[in-house]
Amino acid sequence: MSQAKNKNTGSTIALNKKARFDYHIVEKFEAGLALTGWEVKSLRAGKCQLVDSYVLLKDSEAWLLGAHITPLKEASTHVIADPTRTRKLLLHRRELNKLIGAVSQTGHTCVPLALYWKGNKVKCEIALVKGKKDFDKRETEKERDWNRQKQRVIRDHVKQ
């Protein structure tokens, strides 16, 4: 009897924390990614950054721009690896139509929030977002600080 392989199902590869801070999230979608072999190996090693990446909707297709996947030296020896190449996002037609209609409204855009494993497939969580104003960002920061203070008080009170 063979042993079961250790699969990293549902584990997060990369997060885009800046997007959660800079935007109000309206709706989330799960999209597949069209990748090459060296990119998958690099993602298994966790060599990915989503900061300053965004989703471009063009010709009824979705494309991931600005995501940086660092190539491994061992995996990309026979291929010229472009770490920031444009990657196609795989979505259902009705999801694409919904995104295209919403992005055409002023103030809305589409950004990636996370890359993660779902089984042996790489999925990208993208979100339809609306930009925050500076006072919204300050309000979010104040709320986060207040929650931390509450947790400290509760923790210190429970210790005594």
UniProtKB/Swiss-Prot annotation:
CDD domains: SmpB. It is found in: Cytoplasm. PROSITE patterns: SSRP. One of its GO terms (biological process) is trans-translation. GO terms for molecular function: RNA binding. Residues 134-160 are annotated as: Disordered. One of its GO terms (cellular component) is cytosol. The keyword Cytoplasm applies. Keywords: Cytoplasm, RNA-binding. The keyword rRNA-binding does not apply. Its main location: cytoplasm. InterPro entries: SmpB (IPR023620), SsrA-bd_prot (IPR000037), SsrA-bd_prot_CS (IPR020081). Belongs to the SmpB family. Required for rescue of stalled ribosomes mediated by trans-translation. Binds to transfer-messenger RNA (tmRNA), required for stable association of tmRNA with ribosomes. tmRNA and SmpB together mimic tRNA shape, replacing the anticodon stem-loop with SmpB. tmRNA is encoded by the ssrA gene; the 2 termini fold to resemble tRNA(Ala) and it encodes a 'tag peptide', a short internal open reading frame. During trans-translation Ala-aminoacylated tmRNA acts like a tRNA, entering the A-site of stalled ribosomes, displacing the stalled mRNA. This is SsrA-binding protein.
